[in-house]
Design a protein with these regions (language model features):
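Intrinsically disordered, low-complexity, charged terminal extensions of DNA damage-control enzymes
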Residues: 1-16, 22, 185-349
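Catalytic cores of DNA base-excision repair glycosylases
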Residues: 3-194, 200-209, 213, 279-282
Length: 349
């Protein structure tokens, strides 16, 4: 029995049922793949269902307001995915008459669609023999074949895609891709893989050389940067406050937030009270500043560790464009701010 036949036999038994697996509609496959990037399936599935309910077609997504898309995406993180999703939906409607490109090469021209996503769509929806390479595929092949190639090296994708392509064949490439990823997600998992009942144990190089814990190999560790955010939550007798949209490139672009003072370290009450930016929003001589959370909230991103402190400023009058507190839930905000808003304004009322 060949390796591929064994894999497909395993998949037939262990294949999980997901809503996007019931369709070969490229819109649904594309949507699921974008949502599930950097996201666990259990977390991503409700978002997929919500997007399909609100935007059942690519035309519906293209016609949506960006704020609607970001609000629906709220909590998934990596918000550039949502912006690219919306941009690409518009491009498919305007440039392709709402019909998805069918080839890997064409799909790669779409914003936010890389090698992996283009391979998934072209193979699952259009039977193009394009091998997908994700973390699961790297892990399964690196262990089975005993590959020491650093998977974060620039040449790793090409090498592992070629290896997967050799195993794939030309029959049902979409099923093969899903089977290989499923095997990595359920059987050949990162820690404590199920080697005892693995159909490939006999020929697995990593198992036979006792190197399961060493493969796949990465040469670089992500450097994590510490950042200190101080959010200013203004409170007035007439229930007004400030929110502004992040426009700069970086984390949370196009999402909304309270006025922010970013510092090099945790700020004391005295240090923040002296910051001239506070006077941009109100007369601080007639305002009362207080710390809401005594200990900073730690919020981990892929390459950044945020330490967030919320400060309340009670004042009679605000300067500039304000919003009503009762409308604050309408704005797309980072999940850490969403949790704060839900707690703070519930307690306040």
């Amino acid at each position: 029995m060949t390796w591929t036949i064994q894999l497909m036999a395993w998949y037939k038994i262990h294949k999980r049922s997901f809503p996007w697996r019931k369709s070969r509609d490229p819109y649904k496959i594309w949507l699921s793949e974008i949502i599930l990037q950097q996201t666990r399936i259990a977390q991503g599935t409700p978002y997929y269902q919500s997007f399909i309910k609100n935007f059942p077609t690519v035309e519906a997504l293209a016609a949506a307001d960006e704020q609607q898309v970001l609000k629906l995406w709220q909590g998934l993180g990596y918000y550039s995915r949502a912006r690219n999703l919306h941009h690409t939906a518009k491009a498919i409607v305007s440039d392709y008459n709402a019909v998805f490109p069918k080839t890997f090469t064409e799909l790669c021209t779409l914003k936010g669609v890389g090698n992996y996503t283009a391979s998934a769509i072209s193979s699952i929806c259009f039977d193009e023999p394009q091998a997908v390479v994700d973390g699961n595929v790297y892990r399964v092949l690196a262990r089975y074949l005993g590959k020491d190639t650093p998977i974060d090296a620039s040449y790793a994708l090409k090498e592992f895609k070629a290896l997967a392509s050799e195993l794939m064949g030309t029959e049902s490439p979409g099923d093969f891709n899903q089977a290989l990823m499923e095997f990595g997600a359920l059987q050949c998992v990162p820690k404590n893989p199920l080697c005892d009942n693995c159909p490939f144990q006999k020929d697995c190089v990593a198992f036979n050389q006792n190197r399961i814990g060493q493969l796949p190999f990465k040469k670089n560790k992500i450097k994590v940067t510490d950042r200190y955010f101080n959010y200013l939550v203004f409170v007035t007798p007439d229930a007004k406050t400030f929110l502004s949209q992040r426009t700069a490139k970086g984390i949370w672009q196009h999402l909304y937030e309270f006025p922010l003072v970013e510092s090099a370290q945790l700020l004391t009450f005295e240090e923040l009270a002296k910051d001239p930016i506070l006077f941009k929003y109100t007369d601080m001589n007639a305002a009362v500043l207080s710390k809401i959370n005594e200990k900073p909230i730690k919020h981990k991103l892929s390459h950044q560790q945020l330490y967030i402190t919320f400060w309340k400023i009670n004042t009679e009058q605000l300067l500039g464009v304000v919003i009503d507190e009762n409308k604050i839930h309408n704005y797309p905000v980072p999940i850490v701010l969403q949790k704060f808003i839900e707690n703070f304004y519930t307690l306040k009322t």
